[in-house]
Amino acid sequence: MSEHESVRPQQNPQPKSSVTETSDDGFVETSEHRKFVEFSDACKAYRYIGLCYGPPGVGKTLSARRYSRADSLAGYDRWNDVTMPPIMFDTVLYTAEVVNTPSRVALDLGRAREKLTSIAVRPIEREAHTVLETIRLRDEARRREILERPGCSPCDRPAMDPIYFQTYQYYQARQKEVSDPTTLIVVDEADRLQMNSLEQVRSVFDSGDMGMILIGMPGIEKRIARFPQLYSRIGFVHEFRPLGAAEVQGLLERCWTPPGVTLPDSGLTPEVVARLVRMTGGNLRLLTRLLTQVERVLGVNDAQVISVEIVEAARDSLVIGQA
């Protein structure tokens, strides 16, 4: 991409920084990811349906999982959440099944939203357990003290202090007051949804005060246009593009590697970087696969330097194209 290439006017907010960053867990925060975050925030704030489309491998699903904190949510156990991070979950990520029906879509979305509600209620449940256990132990000690008095019979056993029941009812009322925290539903692989399932998705959107994002391949916007009732509710459209050559080059020059991949510390020569940029075309999934194969080829040849020949050998073991 030429440095002097004209820049077309942007209809959506642009990220404050175009620098590609990596997080501690290896996630690549590209400029496209930051645009997706701003797009998602807008859908959430304005309660619109957003349509996100892009070729495979550019990072749509990864960005959606990152935004919704799906990885943290997947390990949540309501009854054993000691390690649960103190963050608010308000985004549902739903991946459409290959075979789907309206009832199944409604059931899956309902369960996902109930899970967010259970997380929102859990702090109250923990507090209630602690307070009620303290009251119970206090009452138990008091009953024991009375029963151990000289001349006391089992018939003299005192009744439980009504404060326990009042406290229990108080916390039950607090839990019932907790509303559904869902403010955004992200539907990945929306291309799989049939007409009736899309109508069910629209019904879910209409029934709640929330935003929604449909993620799919290029062409999904034309398919959705055939459903006027759904199409009329779309407020934002975002195209998830491949990484620019300069961004991929900057990523490689900082010796970025996918999670689980270890490459020599000697770095990459400009020729190798240029070859990787040209081979992958900004496709993040393809870049990840290619670097994984580079690691394998280095091990097979007991080499310590990444050369153009090593990259070519790694390329030959892959089907280069839109992955």
Predicted region positions:
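Post-Walker A helix-loop "phosphate-sensing" segment adjacent to the P-loop in P-loop NTPases
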Residues: A70-P85, K115
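Walker A/P-loop nucleotide-binding motif
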Residues: R47-S68
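A short hydrophobic beta-strand->loop->alpha-helix junction that borders the nucleotide-binding pocket
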Residues: D81-N100
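Pre-Walker A adenine-sensing motif
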Residues: H33-K44
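Sensor-1/coupling segment of RecA-like P-loop NTPase cores
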Residues: G54, P162-Q166, L193, V204-P228, ...
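C-terminal alpha-helical "lid" subdomain
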Residues: S2-P15, E38, F89, D139-P158, ...
